[in-house]
C-alpha cells in the first residue's frame, strides 16, 4: 500500500492528522512521526489530547494528509489508530521529544496507524485515485 513515492513524501514532510467525534472535526500537525518497518505510521503523543478522545469515541478512525509543498505531490491516508503507552516505539518518541525540548516535554505514548486506504491528492489525472 505504501509505494516508494508515498513513503518518500511521508518521510520528508509534516503530517496533518484528522479525527472526528460527535460531529466535531479536529486536525493537528505532527512533527514526531515515522513509517514503521511493516508499513504502519507511528505518531508520538505530546499534545494529542483531542485526537485521543476522538479515536476512543470513533473506534480508532483517523485520516492523515501529507504533501510536498514544492511539487504538490500529496496523499490522503485513512486508517485505524491504536494507542500504545510502552514499548520500543514509545521509547523512540520519548527520546526524540526529550532531545528537542531538553526535558521540558515528554511523549506520553504513541499512535500506531494501520493503513486502510491511500488516495492520491496530487493535482492531475491521478487525483482521487486509490493506490
Task: Identify the function of each model-found stretch.
Residues 1-131:
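Binding-site signature for planar aromatic cofactors or substrates
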Amino acid at each position: 500500500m505504501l509505494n516508494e513515492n508515498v513513503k518518500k513524501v511521508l518521510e520528508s514532510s509534516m503530517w496533518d492528522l484528522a479525527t472526528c467525534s460527535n460531529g466535531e472535526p479536529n486536525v493537528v500537525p505532527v512533527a514526531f512521526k515515522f513509517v514503521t518497518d511493516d508499513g504502519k505510521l507511528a505518531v508520538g503523543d505530546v499534545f494529542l489530547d483531542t485526537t485521543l478522545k476522538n479515536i476512543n469515541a470513533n473506534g480508532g478512525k483517523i485520516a492523515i494528509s501529507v504533501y510536498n509543498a514544492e511539487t504538490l505531490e500529496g496523499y490522503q491516508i485513512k486508517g485505524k489508530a491504536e494507542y500504545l503507552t510502552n514499548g520500543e516505539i514509545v521509547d523512540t518518541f520519548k527520546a526524540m521529544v526529550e532531545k528537542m525540548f531538553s526535558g521540558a516535554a515528554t511523549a506520553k505514548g504513541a499512535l500506531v496507524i494501520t493503513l486502510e486506504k491511500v488516495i492520491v491528492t496530487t493535482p492531475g489525472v491521478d487525483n482521487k485515485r486509490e493506490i
